[in-house]
């Protein structure tokens, strides 16, 4: 059995680790809230933009409009945009999205394509750069804001547009982690280009807030009710032609889709980190309890041994 000092040192170490994981859990919880706020703040613009596109769509057939972002040409090459985190300590978040990319990449190779990868996040960059012999990497992006902004999405969007408009890629897919609930998220594959605008569907979002109870910080959940979008008047007169309008609006729509994917991924990362740190805190608490029990047993055994030695010495 380990000596008392070793056990005592381990107990102190575990308790200190628990303080760190608990702090990281609370920080992640606060940042999840910020990430969700960012999504809600950007939604009015995205929703209005979708309404304008729907209005134009109701007047003309997109298929008849000469816009390069809507053109569906023969698919010869495909680009995959992969969004991961820059950091770890977030459970299986990075592993799950990388596995999804590998599966999709293998499917496309089996179909006869040679996909290019556009990587976002240090974890994806590090993983696939170590396997350059198996994966073709086109470009990389890292060190984005933890709560993504429009500026963060610009670089990724411009790279996607350059690939598609230069016909280096005939289709662009984005693979990111969709935020479902605080304890549930899932990697998804979405086609970005060619665009097929169908409007922005609002969901019954869950919002998480930090609260206090019995002098402890907790996280509570509430729901944001789905709002009814205001329809644009059907008699709006557009001065520009549909081609000119779409050439201006579709890149904005694409950038909004990229931003939404970045924001969902950020919220998922933070939620996974919060869950992972919560589990780590629980494990640390359980381990500390086990070590305390071991320490008490060792201490009791040492005291018993000393008593026996004293009694034995007296008998002599």
From Swiss-Prot:
Q: Name one GO molecular function term.
A: ATP binding
The question of whether Nucleotide-binding is a record keyword is answered with no
Where is it predominantly found? Answer: membrane
Q: Which GO terms describe its cellular component?
A: plasma membrane-derived thylakoid membrane; proton-transporting ATP synthase complex
Q: Which UniProt keywords apply?
A: ATP synthesis, CF(1), Hydrogen ion transport, Ion transport, Membrane, Thylakoid, Transport
Family assignment?
Belongs to the ATPase gamma chain family.
| Purpose of the protein | Produces ATP from ADP in the presence of a proton gradient across the membrane. The gamma chain is believed to be important in regulating ATPase activity and the flow of protons through the CF(0) complex.
**What's the protein here called?**
ATP synthase gamma chain
Tell me which species this is from.
Prochlorococcus marinus (strain AS9601)
């Amino acid at each position: 059995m380990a000596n008392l000092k070793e056990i005592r040192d381990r107990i102190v170490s575990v308790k200190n680790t628990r303080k760190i994981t608990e702090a990281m859990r609370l920080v992640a919880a606060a940042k999840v809230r910020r990430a969700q706020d960012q999504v809600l703040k950007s939604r009015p613009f995205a929703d209005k933009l979708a309404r304008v596109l729907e209005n134009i769509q109701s007047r003309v057939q997109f298929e008849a409009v000469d816009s390069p972002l809507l053109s569906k040409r023969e698919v010869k090459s495909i680009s995959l945009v992969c969004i991961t985190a820059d950091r770890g300590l977030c459970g299986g978040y990075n592993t799950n999205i990388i596995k999804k990319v590998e599966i999709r990449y293998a499917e496309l190779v089996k179909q006869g394509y040679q996909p290019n990868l556009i990587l976002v996040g240090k974890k994806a960059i590090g993983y696939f750069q170590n396997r350059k012999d198996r994966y073709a990497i086109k470009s990389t992006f890292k060190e984005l804001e933890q709560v993504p902004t429009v500026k963060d999405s610009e670089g990724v969007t411009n790279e996607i547009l350059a690939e598609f408009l230069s016909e280096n890629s005939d289709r662009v897919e984005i693979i990111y982690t969709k935020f479902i609930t605080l304890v549930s998220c899932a990697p998804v594959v979405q086609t970005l280009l060619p665009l097929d605008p169908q409007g922005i569907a609002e969901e019954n979002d869950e919002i998480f807030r930090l609260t206090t109870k019995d002098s402890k910080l907790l996280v509570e959940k509430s729901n944001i009710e789905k709002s009814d979008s205001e329809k644009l008047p059907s008699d709006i007169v557009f001065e520009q032609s549909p081609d000119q309008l779409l050439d201006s609006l579709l890149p904005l729509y694409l950038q909004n889709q990229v931003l939404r994917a970045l924001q969902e991924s950020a919220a998922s990362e933070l939620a996974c980190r919060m869950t992972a740190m919560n589990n780590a805190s629980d494990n640390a608490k359980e381990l500390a309890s086990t070590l305390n029990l071991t320490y008490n047993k060792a201490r009791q055994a040492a005291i018993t041994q000393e008593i026996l030695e004293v009694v034995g010495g007296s008998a002599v």
